[in-house]
Amino acid sequence: MRYTPIIGSQDDDVEYQSIKPKHYPCPQCGKRGKRKHVITRRIAHVAALNRRSWIVADVGVYKARCACCKYFQAAIPDVPPRGRYSLEVRNTVANALIRDRMPYLSVIRRMQEDYRLALSLGYIHACFLWAHEQINMETHWDFVRTNFSTLHRI
């Protein structure tokens, strides 16, 4: 079990969510499963500067009625499946890497100072790869062909 710092001190920003309907569709096939129990998930989030931010969600665990899986959890909005960080954290890291052109270790230091998040080097690299996958290469090459043709105009 991972160590989790105490959540709920006065300097923390906590957003509570409840995602636990009686029935929820399977993520693979869409067949509805029945809720068996409820767990609490704590996901690190980026909200305000110099404050730790969390999403604390009560999430339903469902028994599948299909052959895709035995059990599954309800999806939390803006959090990847089995994710420890929200998509906003991933987006903030990707912006620091690409738009601000910061090196990996500077991004780690910045996230620690600004948002009190201790991120690993592997997670920073995964955010960079995720941002690279978001690029639509067909539209990129169309842009390059129209704006940077091989003919030089004088």
Locate the predicted segments by residue:
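Short, flexible loop/hinge motifs at secondary-structure junctions
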Residues: M1-P80
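Short, positively charged, Gly/Tyr-enriched micro-motifs
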Residues: A48-L151
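Extended mixed-charge, aromatic/glycine-enriched low-complexity segments
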Residues: I154
